[in-house]
């Protein structure tokens, strides 16, 4: 009898079903099978669970979540099998073998379109061949196991795979993809000029929303030499965690007005305003407030809207009046995985990393896991598929 693989399937918005699938058979050139260790629940997983399934709207690579499908892409796994002719090395040229612990980029790109050839460091691919693990591949596409919320997962031949350093714990490695998304702070720093533009050492950073993405930006801003870090959220639990990870000022949006928050940001920045505001809440209504918080020549980083949840009215004069730069964030750099893992190792003792993952659940309890992840007293929620 062939081995069966247990997986948590999102059959429709709000509906989870534990199902079993045949263990995949690899043909020559046919990719890789990993034994899933664990995967974090991402904001896009929550959006798909709620039925907010549109991504990359307005581009040639626009798609909707392919219900029914297996979610999970912030993953760490062990190489179980490698098809002949595939994956001799990882993205950085490190040799790969069965038994290696790896993570991977969720986006599988064609490698041949304009964007793949001109921006190979970033998954901009506009080809219809582009896929996204835990999102765009239905269980009706063989071999079904395209998400990490399963005991085993199948990786396509063009997947960018990254070997995890032996010294990095699986819990910390699970945060790699999330921490890669903070690279827009690096982009903001590139804009620095002595006339006051951009973000430099000692600059004031505001982070709107302190879920896992917001907390990752707190960590990155502190690593990059931010001066005052100010965080807004509606959960005291999350704001207290932000303080533990290096935030200087935390503001509960349910206990303060927008006018009070804007005033407090000005007071904390010598009356100038923030050099950078990172929108990580995924709530369109907070954007105008973030623009108001900026100093002249400030940079607004839009990091919280990977899914299309609608728009807002925005007075464009506010952008012009202060020479505001707006940087969108659709994804993360494929080149960022190894540097991110090395960066986390270097700063292993500088942050209470063990507090980042607040909950762990089994595959059988996936529905409870994703509902917990949307609550006010959780940070990164992880689903454990195999203990080792």
What are these regions (language model features)?
Residues 151, 165-255:
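Mid-domain Rossmann-like dinucleotide-binding core that forms the NAD(H)/NADP(H) cofactor-binding site
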Residues 272-278, 298:
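Short SAM/SAH-binding signature in class I
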Residues 243, 248, 284-348, 385-388:
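Glycine-rich phosphate-binding loop and adjacent beta-alpha segment
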Residues 2-3, 288-292, 334-388:
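C-terminal hydrophobic helical "lid"/dimerization subdomain
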Residues 258-270:
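Short amphipathic alpha-helix with an adjacent loop that forms part of the alpha/beta core around
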Residues 106-150, 189-198:
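Phosphate-binding beta-alpha-beta segment of Rossmann-like dinucleotide-binding domains, i.e.
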């Amino acid at each position: 009898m062939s081995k069966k693989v247990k997986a948590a399937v999102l059959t429709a918005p709000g509906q989870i079903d534990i199902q079993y699938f045949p263990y995949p058979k690899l043909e020559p050139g046919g990719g890789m099978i990993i034994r899933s260790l664990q995967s974090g629940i991402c904001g896009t997983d929550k959006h798909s669970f709620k039925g907010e399934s549109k991504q990359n709207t307005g581009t040639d690579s626009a798609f909707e979540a392919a219900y029914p499908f297996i979610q999970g892409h912030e993953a760490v796994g062990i190489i179980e099998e490698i098809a002949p002719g595939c994956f001799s090395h990882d993205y950085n040229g490190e040799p790969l073998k069965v038994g290696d612990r790896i993570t991977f980029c969720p986006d599988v790109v064609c490698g041949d379109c304009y964007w793949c050839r001109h921006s190979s460091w970033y998954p901009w691919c506009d080809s219809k061949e582009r896929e996204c693990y835990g999102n765009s591949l239905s269980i009706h596409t063989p071999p079904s196991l395209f998400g990490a919320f399963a005991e085993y997962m199948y990786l396509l031949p063009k997947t960018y795979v990254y070997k995890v350093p032996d010294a990095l714990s699986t819990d910390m490695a699970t945060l790699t993809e999330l921490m890669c998304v903070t690279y827009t702070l690096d982009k903001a720093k590139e804009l620095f000029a002595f006339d006051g533009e951009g973000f430099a050492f000692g600059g004031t950073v505001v982070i709107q929303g302190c879920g896992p993405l917001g907390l990752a930006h707190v960590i990155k801003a502190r690593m990059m030499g931010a001066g005052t870090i100010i965080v807004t959220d509606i959960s005291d639990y999350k704001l207290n965690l932000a303080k533990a990870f290096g935030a200087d000022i935390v503001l509960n949006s349910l206990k303060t007005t927008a006018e009070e928050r804007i005033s407090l940001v000005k007071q904390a920045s010598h009356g100038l305003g923030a050099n950078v505001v990172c929108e990580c809440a995924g709530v369109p209504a907070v954007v105008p407030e973030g623009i108001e918080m900026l100093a002249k020549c400030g940079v607004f980083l839009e990091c919280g809207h990977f899914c299309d949840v609608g728009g807002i009215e925005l007075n464009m004069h506010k952008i012009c009046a202060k020479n505001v730069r707006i940087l969108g964030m659709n994804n993360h750099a494929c080149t960022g995985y190894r540097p991110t893992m090395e960066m986390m190792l270097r700063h292993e003792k500088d942050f209470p990393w063990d507090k980042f993952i607040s909950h762990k659940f089994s595959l059988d309890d996936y529905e409870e896991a994703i509902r917990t992840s949307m609550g006010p007293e959780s940070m990164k929620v992880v689903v454990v598929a195999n203990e080792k």
